[in-house]
Amino acid sequence: MATLFAKSSSIRGENATAAPGESTDANCGDALSIVRKDFAQYFPLMKIAIITGGSRGLGKSMSLHLAGKGRDVILTYNSKKVEADAVVVQIEKMGRKAVALQLDVANHKSFKVFSENVKNTLRDNWQRNDFDFLVNNAGIGIHASFMETTEEQFDQLMNIHLKGTFFLTQKLLPLVKDGGRIVNLSSGLARFSLPGYAAYAAMKGGIEVLTRYMAKELGARRITVNAVAPGAIETDFGGGAVRDNKQINDFIASQTALGRVGLPDDIGGAVASLLSDDSGWINGQRVEVSGGVSL
């Protein structure tokens, strides 16, 4: 650090005399270049994550875990602005910067405007034109048997989980920094089967295939793409059945090697780890975070 300030002092004029035939402006330009390099060394560029559905449940946990690892966060919400603003306050109390933006991932026509909002937010809050991490987390759950699932329910799940992830990522990709990371949320239900989740699991299976294709095609930009597949988690997802129904909770725990149902922090911590500097060589993978359910 002393080197940085020593070099900066010479720019202020103490040692800025030019040799015969040399330009003082040229000397200052060279010195400024050195200082910029030192500044980048001591103060690396802050990394920014966008987390869809970050106002509650798993997305909230991801936001807080990433902030705990020194990341800044842009989180999205659909209708729960109060909850989203509360997460922003929590992150700011941790010494990090956060912004909440409204986004309906089922409304694909809104993605262009959302992309512009992200661009303006990056410029106004971070003086940047790109971000580092995208976590496609937003989603809903619909419990219905194969025979009872309606076309409307099927389309709703597809528009949010599969089509939304596909086209939102496509729209935001020009803003993702080269060497960045993308995490798509899948589900343990894409591996094991439980009655009532045929349509939901089909979308998550699609996410896992999409993840591999994205990893292949975005490799030229050194962008890694992975899928995180949670098991059953105690949240308000799907009406909070796993959290609030003791019979369901006990059954899932009995089918899990570690003997309990998952918690939001189990997933938030896993996603934060996948976005850490130590995980840059993981690419195109499905990472199940379920405590070993249905082994």
Would you name each region that the model predicts?
Residues S55-R56:
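Conserved glycine-rich cofactor-binding loop
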Residues G219, T224, I282-G284:
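Short, small/polar-rich loop/turn modules that mediate ligand/substrate recognition or access, typified
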